[in-house]
């Protein structure tokens, strides 16, 4: 059964035991999966990679049938999944799981994907596509962020930030965090320093990049 990404607040894990999130928009997937988890904080969270499950399917089976006084209710997240996981999902479907919920996190799945088709046709399981964000959505997210943090930026700077995010809110949030760190000491965002800020390498901690690299560059100008 297909539902829209904005409908995740309607998900009831007691009824919808297995959910597929798929798509290229990693930021949206993370956000929506977090929403589901936060609505079920009483459940124990377990994370696996598809390779782990394929190498040892008993990982999932044991979690389904093993009961503990402390973690009867569980949410199992299986990441980086492909069509290879389908047989295990079909096996799980044959068992009536009660206290376990499973979230499947996949990258983009083509229409011919057997995994996607299985979830789309199912009456019991949910399928939530997470398509790339458009410019309008990213602009709203960025504006809301700056408004909440009370950071003043021009429309031109806002456009610059959004344009480099490749239609993915995860990229946007990374850039917004850089800016938040930068202005924490009373520094102002300008056309000149925003280009330096958003082009900093991603393989360092954001705070380290902003506080060290950018600060040094600005002192030289």
Summary of predicted features, one role per range:
Residues 1-220:
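Conserved beta/loop motifs at nucleotide-recognition and modification sites
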């Amino acid at each position: 059964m297909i539902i829209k990404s904005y409908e995740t607040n309607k998900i009831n894990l007691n009824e919808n035991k297995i959910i597929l999130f798929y798509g290229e928009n990693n930021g949206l997937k993370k956000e929506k999966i977090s929403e589901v988890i936060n609505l079920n904080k009483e459940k124990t969270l377990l994370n696996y990679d598809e390779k782990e499950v394929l190498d040892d399917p008993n990982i999932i089976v044991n979690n389904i049938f093993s009961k503990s006084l402390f973690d009867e209710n569980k949410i199992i997240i299986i990441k980086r999944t492909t069509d290879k996981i389908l047989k295990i999902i079909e096996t799980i479907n044959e068992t009536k799981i009660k206290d376990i919920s499973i979230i499947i996190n996949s990258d983009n799945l083509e229409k011919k994907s057997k995994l996607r088709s299985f979830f789309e046709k199912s009456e019991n399981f949910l399928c939530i596509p997470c398509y790339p964000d458009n410019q309008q959505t990213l602009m709203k997210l960025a504006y809301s962020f700056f408004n909440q943090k009370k950071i003043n930026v021009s429309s031109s700077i806002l456009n610059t930030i959004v344009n480099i995010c490749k239609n993915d809110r995860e990229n946007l949030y990374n850039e917004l965090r850089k800016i938040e760190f930068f202005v924490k000491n009373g520094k102002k965002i300008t056309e000149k320093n925003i280009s330096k800020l958003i082009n900093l390498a991603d393989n360092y901690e954001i705070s380290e990049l902003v506080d060290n690299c950018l600060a040094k560059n600005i002192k030289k100008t």
